[in-house]
From Swiss-Prot:
Disulfide bonds: none
Domain of life: Eukaryota
Molecular function (Gene Ontology), one example: DNA-binding transcription repressor activity, RNA polymerase II-specific
Name of the protein: DNA-binding protein scr1
Cellular component, GO, one term: cytoplasm
Biased amino acid composition, Low complexity: 80-102, 391-413, 479-492, 517-526, 537-555
Example GO biological process: negative regulation of transcription by RNA polymerase II
Organism of provenance: Schizosaccharomyces pombe (strain 972 / ATCC 24843) (Fission yeast)
């Protein structure tokens, strides 16, 4: 339908009347119309060619549309649960699936063909039969389809669902056996739970009536398998599971977890979820499936299968096999209880029951003797967030930090510590007596320690008598004296006789041995003016010459022989 026709029928003006001057680079090759966008041109060309690429994906509906919005509007009819057309389309899809030659239609009951009939689920309007249950023939490799549940988990053997007693038919080597409704694996939300095929290619026909009487089903019989009954079955299974007391599995009734999709199956055992051993003397057993309450209703990854081990001739056990996936306890001591770090998940908390399978890289396997310990349900949370360095390795290879020795409930793994680990040097205070204190960098030098070239000049009060005129001019406190103050003091001293000038040096030389510590700190004024390095002899001369002479040249003339030791 062109845009002009659309504008006429809807009563709204087309884009050509809104902005006629806008450029229209996309022109129709079959007519004279031009469009603003390429999508509009493509949609218009389909009106000429009659192409309808948008196909309705609902089973039984063969309508096609040229526009995606028309398909979206049409799909709302099928999603309406109260629509009678929905039920009629589902019935038509069921009839067409039986008569067609598709893999889903080749599931008629026979002794040589391996197939599963889900007539109860196919009669439900809300069930989507677009997930075909394809069972290969004898000798073909069996692999579960994408739509099947990738994770299956066992329930305690004392579980029994309160459902109506219906008859199911189990065909083994062409011989039918009547089974109660507990052995009927129900399909919930339109997704097949598993492939039900044995090793020798036998077929499990899960129907409300025998396989030959499928076409003779009445309308009330088909309504018994509606979505309401499936939801009641799921709720009854969940309530029974929550109210179930804790048991300890024994060797006679081992309830083990089914292996995950990547776990290898033991040799000569089943490879498909829900498969049955080829035994002619099988007896009824409980088998049901409930959806994962932790996921959405249409999820295909949360379906669980319930199976138990009854007597020696039960449906899932015989004299040589305990479970269809695990060898007997005499052959292997490894139990999948401990391999995935949890026991029966019926005893796990409500919020963590199915979270173990959603966080698969955080589980750490541990091999034990196959018996559950009496640990609390909080152990499930310990193993849930215990991350492995490599998800495919059997055990962790990364060393955990000593700081995080206890397991944590936080999602942060313990291989990346947030604090200083134990192998780093500990920081201690500076005044810690246990630490070895090294000298600072500023106190270290490559040159040997030297006396400063110009040490401060200090005067000893014992070196001079009280009658010395210059004793009051020099400060008696040990403080440094500048060169200018020394020159002023020496120039202002009065003239003294020569006999009196010898008193000072004699007194200094007599007391020099008792005061060696003070003589090394005295510096001659003449040496300071001349710039020569200090010496003990010159320091003694400075004390005598500075107070015995009056000339500013500070000569030491006759005092030189008296200063030798």
């Amino acid at each position: 339908m062109s845009e002009a026709t659309t504008a006429t029928t809807t009563g709204k003006p087309s884009r050509s009347t809104k902005n006629p001057d806008a450029p229209r680079p996309y022109k129709c090759p079959l007519c004279t119309k031009a469009f603003y966008r390429l999508e509009h041109q493509t949609r218009h060309i389909r009106t000429h060619t009659g192409e309808k690429p948008h196909v309705c994906t609902f089973p039984g509906c063969a309508k096609r549309f040229s526009r995606s919005d028309e398909l979206t509007r049409h799909a709302r009819i099928h999603t309406n649960a109260n629509s009678r057309r929905n039920a009629a389309a589902a019935a038509a899809a069921n009839n067409s699936a039986r008569s067609s030659n598709s893999p889903a239609g080749n599931l008629e009951p026979s002794t040589n063909n391996a197939g599963v009939h889900m007539t109860n689920a196919s009669m439900n309007p809300n069930v989507n039969p677009s997930y075909p249950v394809f069972i290969p023939q004898v000798g073909m490799s069996v692999a579960p389809p994408v739509a099947t549940a990738a994770v299956s988990m066992s329930y305690p053997h004392h579980y029994s669902a309160s459902v109506q007693q219906q008859q199911a038919t189990f065909v083994s080597n062409g011989q039918p056996h009547n089974l109660p409704a507990q052995a009927q694996p129900a399909t919930i939300y339109g997704i097949p739970d598993a492939l039900h095929t044995t090793q020798n290619g036998t077929t499990i026909h899960v129907t409300g009536t025998p396989p030959g009487a499928v076409s003779q089903r009445s309308e009330p019989d088909s309504r018994l398998s509606s979505m309401n009954e499936m939801q009641l079955l799921a709720s009854a299974a969940a309530n029974q599971l929550d109210a179930a007391p804790r048991i300890t599995p024994t060797k006679s009734s081992g309830v083990n977890l089914m292996p995950l999709s990547n776990a290898p199956s033991p040799p000569k055992q089943m490879n498909v979820v829900g498969s049955l051993p080829s035994s002619s003397n099988t007896s009824p057993n409980h088998l049901a499936s409930v959806p994962n309450r932790g996921l959405t209703s249409n999820s295909s990854t949360g379906s669980f299968t319930k199976y138990t081990n009854g007597s020696s001739n039960s449906l899932y056990s015989n004299s040589s096999m305990q479970t269809p996936y695990l060898p007997s306890k005499s052959n292997s001591s490894t139990s999948l209880h401990s391999m995935y770090g949890v026991g029966t998940t019926a005893y796990a908390p409500q919020s963590l029951r199915y979270a173990h399978y959603n966080y698969l890289p955080y589980s750490r396997p541990s091999v034990s003797n196959g018996f559950d310990d009496d640990s609390s349900s909080s152990d499930f949370a310990h193993f849930r967030y215990q991350r492995r360095s490599r998800p495919v390795s059997p055990c962790s290879t990364a060393p955990s930090s000593p700081t995080f020795s206890t397991r944590s409930f936080s999602p942060t793994p313990d291989v990346t510590p947030l604090v200083t680990p134990a192998h780093s040097p500990r920081l201690r205070p500076m005044d810690d007596p246990s630490c070895v204190q090294l000298p600072s960098i500023r106190s270290l030098s490559l040159r040997p320690s030297q006396v400063p070239l110009i040490p401060p000049l200090k005067c000893d009060p014992n070196a001079f008598s009280a009658s010395t005129p210059a004793s009051g001019a020099v400060s008696r406190t040990p403080s440094s004296v500048s060169l200018s103050s020394l020159s002023n003091v020496n120039s202002s001293m009065p003239h003294k006789p020569a006999s009196q000038s010898n008193v000072g040096p004699v007194r200094i030389s007599s007391n020099r041995r008792s005061r060696k510590f003070s003589s090394s700190s005295r510096v001659s004024v003449s040496n300071l003016l001349a710039g020569s390095p200090p010496s003990p002899s010159s320091s003694t001369k400075s004390a005598s010459s500075s107070y015995s002479t009056t000339t500013p040249a500070f000569s030491i003339g006759p005092l030189t022989p008296m200063t030798k030791p």
